[in-house]
Amino acid sequence: MVPEPRPGGALLWPAAILRRTNVMDHRHPVSGLRYPVSGIRYPVSGIVKIAARLWTRLIHPMTPSRFDALTSQFARLRVGVIGDFSLDRYFDIDPAKAETSLETGLPVHNVTRVRCSPGAAGNIVQNLGALGAGTLWPIGFCGEDGEGFELLKALRAVPGVSLDNFLRTPDRRTFTYTKPLVHQPSKAPVELSRLDIKNWLPTPSDVEEELGIALRNLGPELDALIVMDQAGVPDAGVVTPAILRHVRDLTLAHPRLFVVADSRHGLGRFPPLIFKMNAAEFAVLNGGRADAALPELKAGAERLATASKRPVFITLAERGIVGAAPGVPAVHVPALPVRGGIDIVGAGDSVTAALTLALAAGAQIEEAMVLAQAAASIVIHQLGTTGAAHVPELRARLFP
């Protein structure tokens, strides 16, 4: 739970927080520290700094030396990312330049800038690169179209990327999110209705076979693999049943390989891997509720980790993240305090990237979750873009 913004540059602790607070001694319900009744309202800058320091000292176990030891390993790590790569294309619109179409009488939105970046699995690659991963192998496809050209250009700009295993094929369209954003002075960008380009027919078997061969050949080279399923049309993306069989075979051939799976459409069809999901996705998989209380979520994560013999992570937005490993009690790491306006697009990808690098670097699950929460906290404050976090930013966020 984080303070709520109020007009005039102040924050109030939400009513739910105050109801759980001992009114007699005025203790904060998370930190246990006292604060005066008259001091419940604080200036924004002060409360954010106080909350961040309390989170650092009382909630997470990371020390600066441990942080440095883990993140210094990122540069040696070799990570593959197989899944649905999209082009995120932003149309920046200036409403002051609005016109009316002479032909239709409809409003005309004049675009003053076009920005392109890798999306979906590509955004995970971008986050891995920003965190300093040594070598990155995207494994997926794009079409022989303009969007594919822009996607390849954006991927090439990510440090450490090798595109030797990325296919460009005339049999597929490039998965594209086009996001019109209206910009006004002193206001957060407003996104208009999105325009998507997807493939609606099954992925050709020869494309699947090429991707499977790439995965098999890369296996011995990898420290970690991320499987990202986002296409939304059954069997029309990269993560088809055939590709999941290749992933399963890879885990059997390389049992020490960290393989993290993230799917917008449910992990129930996946082989046993390290699962990362949000609360709604976990509810579908586990038969529970997305708004379940923490004890219920922790118990469910423990059961799933025991059954799969792999760690499980559940992201909970403003409630933080829950993680469990086989035979180890589940752990909850709260979210960091919010600092002004936020944009949650891309936060899940930053969590996936940070969790994967941390685990491959030797982190315990709680340490990995701390790094992931710091990454998400940075990304959500990057407005109008999917965003990415860098190691120095993580350090500054965790140790203010």
Label each residue range with its predicted role.
Residues 336-355:
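Short glycine/threonine-rich catalytic loop with a Thr-x-Gly-x-Asp
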Residues 6, 27-46, 53:
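Arg/Gly-rich low-complexity intrinsically disordered repeat tracts
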Residues 20-23, 61:
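Residue-level detector of intrinsically disordered terminal segments
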Residues 13-21:
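N-terminal polybasic/positive-inside topogenic patches
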Residues 9-11:
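Targeting/processing segments of secretory and organellar proteins
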Residues 54-99, 103, 110-342, 361-363, ...:
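Ribokinase/PfkB-type carbohydrate-kinase core domain
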Residues 16, 39, 46-49, 58:
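Generic short N-terminal amphipathic or hydrophobic helices
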